[in-house]
Amino acid sequence: MRKACSPAEPVFTHPEFDHETRIVSAIVAGVSVSSIYVPNGGKDFNAKIRFLEALIAHAHRCAAEGQPIVFCGDLNVAHREIDVHPKERKETVIGQLPEERALIGRLLAEGLVDVGRTLDPENDQLFTWWPPWRAMRQRNIGWRIDYVLASAAVAAKAVACAAYREVGTSDHAPVVAEI
């Protein structure tokens, strides 16, 4: 990957969030690859919504310019019901609210593909985050809020995408895609 990287100016900037360094990007073999950490919304739900709307606008610009992209990281939204363990499903909590899920839908409508879900569409155990109590991680009672989203042409080259639950350095599992 190092040989395929090239320096680039920031491709997604937002004055409200830049000081938090919520996005790190690089151009890899002509593809804009961004690691993203969406605000969880607990302290300022509207800031989360503004961030997601800005991300959608950025994806739209990239699509209009023909720039292939990969967004990976913590989006802090369980997009669909299958992305939350039945014991954790609560459509009234942040991370599962209909308006948040709709924004992820809008992001995908900009031509992005959910690589993990595409490669394993019916798996209801693809969780990437677990509440830090009652051995939730060990029992795999969690949420899928970490993703690899890619432009269709890039996603078509994906051969694998997995969450490594056994890596316990965080309350999230790293998600790795092989493209």
Regions from the PLM with identified roles:
Residues 53-141, 145:
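Metal-dependent phosphoesterases centered on the DNase I-like endonuclease/exonuclease/phosphatase
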Residues 20-25, 144-146, 172-176:
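Short hydrophobic/aromatic beta-strand or adjacent loop that forms the aromatic wall/cage
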Residues 130-131, 158-165:
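Short, solvent-exposed helix-loop connector elements
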Residues 1-40:
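Structured beta-strand-rich core segments of catalytic domains in phosphoester-bond hydrolases
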Residues 13-14, 37-52, 88-92:
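Surface-exposed cleft-lining segments at the edges of enzyme active sites
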Residues 14-15, 137-140, 165-168:
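Short Gly/Pro-enriched turn/cap motifs at secondary-structure boundaries
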Residues 162-179:
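Surface polyanion/phosphate-binding segment centered on an Asp-His-Pro turn
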